[in-house]
Amino acid sequence: MNTLPGTLNLLLGSIANFSEIYLILILLKLSLAWFPTVNWYNEPFCSLNRITDPYLKLFRGSIPPMFGMDMSPMLGIIFLQCLMVIFNNVRLESA
């Protein structure tokens, strides 16, 4: 009995689901950044910052700011969405 396709399917599905949850967290952080009253040193905002900042720092500085706004999170979101599409397509083909 070959369990590799089932295991691979489960692994790729888990990575795709994790990427989707992470994308929602990034979008939540970017939406909250528009509100000046959010104190990023209090919970739950501090945890949200600690979870999303390492990933977003990878892309910071890769795109110059436009109109005073940092556009590098867009690159991170596009990369994460590409990963989700790839993992979902590979998962569907291996089923």
UniProtKB/Swiss-Prot annotation:
Claim: Transferase is one of the keywords in the record: no
Gene Ontology BP annotations: chloroplast fission; nucleoid organization
GO cellular component: chloroplast; membrane
Protein name: Uncharacterized protein ycf19
Record keyword Transit peptide present: no
Parts of the chain that traverse the membrane: none
Record keywords: Chloroplast, Plastid
Gene: ycf19
One Pfam family linked to the record: YGGT
Similarity field: Belongs to the ycf19 family.
Subcellular location: Plastid, Chloroplast
